[in-house]
Amino acid sequence: MGFRVLVLVVMATTSALPFTFFEEPGRSPFRPALRSEEAQALRHGLTLLLARRADGQPPDMRQPEMRRPEVRQLEFAELSVGQRRWDVDQCMYYCLTGVVGYSYTECQTMCT
């Protein structure tokens, strides 16, 4: 919402503020400083930027996204003794209560 308001303010500012305030004979003191083609191109670009933002497409000038560092799973040897014991117990529990029906020795072989 804030981005849209900012773009609307910029669009309104480009059409209202860029005036020269010196008087020349036969000319209005409020003649736009930008040529109409430049102002129209600027408004068109801002409108496209707003449309992309509304569609969820990333604008061309945004900063690259920050990548999260990959979280590496600890190897079994790097785990603490308590953590290893809990993992083995959990593995044994799921192995023995699972649908496949492994025996205790098969589960112990797989989990340790």
From Swiss-Prot:
Please state the span of the N-terminal signal peptide per the UniProt entry: 1-22
* A cellular-component GO term for this protein: extracellular region
The highest taxon in the source lineage is Eukaryota
Which keywords describe this protein according to UniProt? Cleavage on pair of basic residues, Disulfide bond, Ion channel impairing toxin, Neurotoxin, Potassium channel impairing toxin, Secreted, Signal, Toxin
Disulfide partners: 91-111, 95-107
Tissue expression, per UniProt?
Expressed by the venom duct.
Keyword Zinc-finger assigned to the entry: answer is no
Q: Which residues form the propeptide?
A: 23-85
Q: What would you give as a GO molecular function for this chain, any one? A: toxin activity
Where does it localize? Secreted
Q: Which intervals of the chain form a coiled coil? A: none
Per the record, the major location class is secreted
Q: Is this entry keyworded Signal?
A: yes
- Family, per entry: Belongs to the conotoxin R superfamily.
Q: What is known of its domains?
A: The cysteine framework is XIV (C-C-C-C).
The entry's protein name is: Conotoxin vil14.4
What species was this sequence derived from?
Answer: Conus villepinii
**What taxonomic ancestry is recorded?**
Eukaryota, Metazoa, Spiralia, Lophotrochozoa, Mollusca
